Amino acid sequence: MKITRIISILTLAAALLCSCQAQKPSFVRVEDGMFVCEDYPSHYVGTNFWYGAILGSEGVGGDRARLEAELDTLKALGMTNLRVLVGGDGPDGIPTRVSPTLQKEPGVYNDTIFRGLDYLLAEMAERNMKAVLYINNSWEWSGGYGMYLEWAGAGKALIPAEVGYQPFMESVSRFVTNEKAKELFYDHVRHVVSRTNTVTGKPYKDDPAIFSWQIGNEPRCFREDSEGQDAFVDFLWTTAALIKSLDPNHMVSSGSEGKWGCEGDMALYERIHSCPDIDYMNIHIWPYNWSWVRENTLKTNLPLAIANTDKYIDEHLALAQTYGKPLVMEEFGFPRDDFQFAQGTPVTARDEYYRHVFGRIVESAKEGGLFAGLNFWGWGGFAGQSETDLYWQPGDDYCGDPAQEQQGLNSVYVSDSSTMKVIRDATDAITEVLKK
């Protein structure tokens, strides 16, 4: 073989090797206020799938066959973004808390749940789906603030169903100024973000199946004093910086409800999201929880709920435009007609509300707008319902409604055929827009 041909072959091989080494995983990032990724849309419709890691486990509560069926169904509906709880905190057997939990005591883990999360991410990767992983919770249903305070020696975690929400919120408001509780949480963040997937062998920081790390579900200050709010902002900025130091590849989000979760203070929301380590903005909208509709006005007050929803989106979208960050409405829900919970009962008001909200994201996609994503709450999928228990009990199927809520309150089941069509129409419309 001529020496020139040998050199040519070696040169080509070296070029191919360099090309392979230069290829980067498909991490989503923000550029000019838009989500950018080689193989992922800039605008999307997704859902909340808080129990995904539990389903993926081989322990109590695990059901990998159901998990795979749920993922296949979601993918077929055009949904590729799932918002997932990393895992609960504290002992099992606590009323209104999801079970089994991940972190039993500070730094002591139920590894079956971690392996369930590994399996979930591996299965999502096969379907080109991505997960928003939230690590903490202001509310009781996964432990969260109250559990960290208990571990820090600040008293027993309160259960709102037993003491009421006002005493509960007053209790957990101490979290943002309790240094020991926050340090325990920071240790948990380090452990989670530094994990290596046991299914794929890939460190989480190198896994494109993760869309973003999220500090918590609805992080709140629960306080209006300047000391508390300053500590709250510092907590969120510190956590975001910690995550970025451990994993510079993935985006970080707050998990905030928006102004509603900031004691009605838009300036507080802005202080949080001006953080350079928080890549995009979140809002949640709950027409029933926020009294825009009541049990007997779900249909008659629907126009008011829609008008208030538009106003809330637009108010936060203006701030997103100021900072050049995408806005994701990552939680919203609407009850079934006549405030029923059973599968098969009508969802006409919900469908109309969903149709309007989905229309907003389709229009934003057409305009190349910063309103970039939606995750409705929540996916019930193939879950069955207990004939005797209104609230979740061990052994019941997991659905979109966590243990503190009536099972079926906000869940969207595969049997809700009209809602399935609303979802499919929206994802088809976005796909068609983004093709152009």
Segments and roles (model prediction):
Residues 1-10:
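Bacterial N-terminal signal peptides that target proteins for export
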Residues 25-292, 301-326, 332-352, 356-359, ...:
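Active-site mouth of glycoside hydrolases
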Residues 296:
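Amphipathic helical hotspot of TIR/SEFIR-family domains
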Residues 3, 19-21, 212:
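Intrinsically disordered, low-complexity regions enriched for glutamine and histidine
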Residues 12-27:
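Bacterial Sec-dependent signal peptides at the C-terminal "C-region" and cleavage site
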